[in-house]
Amino acid sequence: MKRIEVWADLVCSWAHIGKRRLEQAEFDEDVEIVWRPYLIDPMAPATAGTFDAHRVVALALDRGGPALQDALVERIMHAYFVDGSDIGDRATLAALAAEAGLDGMAEALDAGEGTDEVRDQLLRGKAIGVTTSPTFVVGESAIAGAQSPEVLADLVRHAVPARELPDEVTRLRHAESLLDLRDPLGALRIMEPLLAEHGDDPSVRLLAARAYFGSAQLGRARETLESLLERTPGDHYARFLLGRTLERANRPVEALPHLRMAAAMSSEADYTDALRRVESRVS
């Protein structure tokens, strides 16, 4: 059975249309549909946003599986698009969940349940390149927008299977993607389990140092990099990043020897540019 992940905002009209087209698609094999969160306006206030609705949808998957989750998504979308209900209201969400067969949501929402899951999934979506509601993902293949039933069937038919990777590897890759997207705080959040369980691993520590540097946590970046370099003094990138950290902390004299060593070990342009810049400040 193939899994179709639908990344969508529940108040997106194209997501509503996409759901109908997904239901009309004729697949060659059994599929399961899993809904993932996407926020068209992540800065929307709680009274107008869909974050709580995404929490309930995530809890439905956790407690009742894809079928219950899909039934709840149907009720939420009907309530919003047909009945004009406020799906940012927790009492409304709890009632809709109960109609779908999921009880106890008022208490769950008040207790904060589902918050971490939704935040983690939002970061995962960002890391894998989701930028549109809806986006349909099957294995390593994806397509954005409310596509026709035929296109959705072709997506499932020709999807590249996802590689089975350890969770640690997946988190590292997602953290790297978030750093490339200039979201260092998101990268650190994704890395929390890695730092807790594999905090001594050099690759984990170096990635964390990059995230600390990117989020201007310069003291933590320096501490992490100095510890790394005690173990692996020949790591030219860690040496370069320590030099850059000290430069940003307005310590050019301390930065200079690290940048000189990094430039001596590797001729990368970033290294030589940083070295020239700091040398001009020190001279």
Residue ranges and their predicted role:
Residues 199, 233, 266-267:
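Short coil turns that delineate tetratricopeptide repeat
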Residues 169, 203, 237, 270-271:
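Start-of-helix register in tetratricopeptide repeats
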Residues 5-10, 16-79:
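Structural alpha/beta surface segment adjacent to cysteine/selenocysteine redox centers
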Residues 19-25, 75-192, 196, 272:
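C-terminal cap of thioredoxin/glutaredoxin-like
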